[in-house]
Amino acid sequence: MDKIEHIGIAVKDLETSNLLFQRLLGTAHYKIEEVASEGVRTSFFKVGNQKIELLEALVAESPIAKFIAQRGEGIHHIAFSVKDIIAEVKRLSSEGFVVLNEKPMRGADNKWVVFLHPKGVNGVLVELCQDIPQAEVE
């Protein structure tokens, strides 16, 4: 794994949370994006070389809506940047980690993403991210 790519925070209201984090960080978000396949709308803030992703549920069945219903707003996941997501999934599977989606799916911010089950990582949902090559970006 190369670096911490971002920290994902589940929020009830993206607009209100964007204003809160703008006041906290002293800078505005640089991107808002919907990930229809996951039923979420996201915004991103830069903090030094790192990012914070705020995630708002768009539908009641989305993973973010379920997370907020069970735990309330707060840190949802930590994401790590990887160079080869397929190789990293194989490595982590061989180490006994439970991969929630072995086939990478398209996530926010032009990334391929895979998630590890939190039960095997001290209760932390881990996301692996690999940049989608520009030629594949729609």
Language model segments and positions:
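Vicinal oxygen chelate
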Residues: 4-12, 33, 43-46, 65-138
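Short Gly/Pro-enriched loop/turn and capping motifs at secondary-structure junctions
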Residues: 59-60, 85
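Long, hydrophobic N-terminal alpha-helical segment
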Residues: 1-40, 47, 62
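Short loop/beta submotifs within extracellular cysteine-rich repeat domains
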Residues: 16-17, 27-28, 52-53, 60-63, ...
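Hydrophobic side chains in well-ordered alpha-helices
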Residues: 17-20, 88-92
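Residues at alpha-helix termini
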Residues: 23-24, 70, 94
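Short, structured motif recognition centered on aromatic/hydrophobic residues
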Residues: 4, 18-21, 45, 52-55, ...
